[in-house]
Amino acid sequence: MTPSNYQRTRWLTLIGTIITQFALGSVYTWSLFNGALSAKLGAPVSQVAFSFGLLSLGLAISSSVAGKLQERFGVKRVTMASGILLGLGFFLTAHSNNLMMLWLSAGVLVGLADGAGYLLTLSNCVKWFPERKGLISAFAIGSYGLGSLGFKFIDTHLLETVGLEKTFVIWGAIVLVMIVFGATLMKDAPKQEVKTSNGVVEKDYTLAESMRKPQYWMLAVMFLTACMSGLYVIGVAKDIAQSLAHLDAISAANAVTVISIANLSGRLVLGILSDKIARIRVITIGQVIALVGMAALLFAPLNAVTFFAAIACVAFNFGGTITVFPSLVSEFFGLNNLAKNYGVIYLGFGIGSICGSIIASLFGGFYVTFYVIFTLLILSLALSTTIRQPEQKMLREAHGSL
């Protein structure tokens, strides 16, 4: 590939990735539909909302096998299939007439489709820009976050004008077209050349080799903690506002806006910063900010100011962590196997999405969950300040052994 074609291909891949990520991020408007689906099915909102828990779990599971899918079929085909399945999932959701069908369509199918496209396109795009990994991650994952914001207005308008069932059908058609079009612009990133230094050739870690390193599991704990804290606080922010900060319903609803802004800010600020300083130090900065937020929720007298500041801190760290982590994992274990190596760590997103709710259900109230998250953040901070990159797997070049 000529230099000019290489540049053209990678920028087209970036554009396709941004379009695809924007469409995939639309699933985070799900809370808009809980009330209408509850009324349609005659089921409690809590049971309807369980669909989103299944969606998050399915997203994490399919993300973990994205690397295998890319190896076999290529990024373009897998992304197209992701878009088609996502559109089908929304179409089936429109025609769901019981909870089980809703859980299978909106939960399992939509989650698996979304996850297959999300991590695959992200890791492929990052590999096209090895010199700007943090910035490219920020663009891609920032687009995913903006998708939830953009489709909030689209879906709200559709709900008001065409009703619940047609909204899901139109929504599915829009994301299908966007993702399939985005996929046509993408190409698989070329395999990265191994680095040579002082007569030594560094090799990428395979998934099996990575999982034998303690650093891999240290990173996994940090990622799980950030996801658990962010997803739990995002999920119950309005309830915390009313129960603990004693805000009225209208003021409490502003938590959604605060979280969206803080989440996006974390993605952009920490993502860009990760190209300037050591990425693990960026993670440490995010953890300190999240600790301040959790400490405020636990120990500070909560009013509107302290509450919004606290949840903003947690959301900022969550957004920044999921942006920086793909590049961080590639820094520790190499770029060529990034989709596989990060895919298993990304299971922490699905596990974290349900852990907070399970703890709250078992022990009741918010505070026990807050204390668990606070403890995990302290542990994660200790890990991020002590972790060191694994010894590079190296092979001496022929001339170096003579």
Locate predicted features:
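Extracytoplasmic gate region of multi-pass secondary transporters
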Residues: 30-34, 208-268
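Intracellular juxtamembrane helix-capping segments at the cytosolic ends
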Residues: 37, 115-129, 136-137, 320-333
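Helix-to-loop junctions at the C-terminal end of transmembrane segments
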Residues: 62-75, 267-278, 364
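Structural signature of the two symmetry-related core transmembrane helices
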Residues: 77-91, 281-296
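Hydrophobic core of transmembrane alpha-helices in multi-pass small-molecule transporters
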Residues: 100-116, 224, 306-319
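Helix-loop-helix hairpin linking two adjacent transmembrane segments in secondary transporters
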Residues: 139, 143-188
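A late C-terminal transmembrane helix in Major Facilitator Superfamily
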Residues: 148, 332-365
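C-terminal membrane-cytosol helix-exit motif in multi-pass small-molecule transporters
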Residues: 172-197, 380-388
